[in-house]
A protein has these predicted regions:
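Non-heme Fe(II)-dependent double-stranded beta-helix
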Residues: 2-10, 15-115, 153, 224, ...
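Generic beta-strand structural signal
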Residues: 83-90, 100-102, 120-126, 136, ...
Length: 243
């Protein structure tokens, strides 16, 4: 199978060694040394505990921007989604020892409410540390993007969680895949793919940069506080190490 057919059939594709050890180390140092996004940091809570998340809508001309607009991410995403894409938002998740995970959800379960009519959206999940079952790596239900959008926050389900009755049934029909990966690997996945993660039971932090994209043709039909279409200035392959 090609990457395109894997993405269409399974809802995701894992690209090994998309970024080098030197590139990842440079970003980790930048995260640790740079406080310019501290005012955007927040804690979020799930059924398994808390997580630290920093989120921003517009890529700036800094090291974060060199990653989030890099041709290694943007060009495959345009191939997978079949359209020009633009930066929807990016976030750094810092899962410290003992921190919780995320309940089962679809990104489009949230983004639907941001006036995006279609699920023609996707994310690139870049590992900055080794991801294992022990430290709460991402889990996906393979092929679950084909189900379509599922209600979130229905009945007694938390607002950020997909309908648990449907999840229980889908778990019987779709393989649950733990995305164990190394630093520098990157997971591309569709906005309707069901995914979750467990708590970090290790003694080490797990850091991730997630870059989310919308397609040009799916520009929100009204203002909802998230990024509308703006042409993306794609960064070159070498722009990270040249920064």
């Amino acid at each position: 199978m090609t990457d395109f057919s894997d993405f269409r059939n399974n809802g995701y594709i894992l690209k090994r060694n998309l970024f080098s050890k030197d590139e990842v180390s440079k970003l980790i140092r930048y995260i640790e040394d740079n406080s310019e996004k501290e005012d955007q940091a927040r804690e979020t809570f799930s059924s398994t505990g808390k997580l630290n998340i920093t989120l921003w809508n517009h890529p700036s001309d800094d090291l974060f921007g060199k990653f989030s607009t890099n041709e290694r991410i943007v060009k495959p995403m345009e191939e997978f989604l079949g359209d020009e894409v633009y930066h929807y938002h990016s976030k750094v998740i810092w899962k410290k020892p003992g921190d919780g995970g995320f309940d089962w959800h679809q990104d489009y379960g949230y983004w639907y409410h941001n006036a995006c009519l279609y699920p023609d959206m996707g994310s690139c999940f870049i590992m900055l540390d080794k991801a294992t079952k022990e430290n709460g790596c991402l889990k996906v239900l393979k092929g679950s993007q084909k189900v379509g959008r599922i209600g979130h926050g229905v009945s007694d389900t938390p607002e950020q969680t997909a309908d648990l009755d449907r999840i229980h049934e889908l778990e019987k029909r779709h393989e649950c895949v733990h995305i164990e990966a190394n630093a520098g690997d990157a997971l591309f996945f569709h906005a309707n793919l069901l995914h979750s993660s467990d708590s970090n039971k290790s003694n080490e932090s797990r850091r991730t940069l997630i870059v989310c994209f919308n397609t040009k043709s799916n520009n929100p039909y009204k203002e909802k506080g998230h990024a509308s279409y703006s042409p993306l200035k794609i960064s070159s392959y070498n722009s990270i190490m040249e920064y």
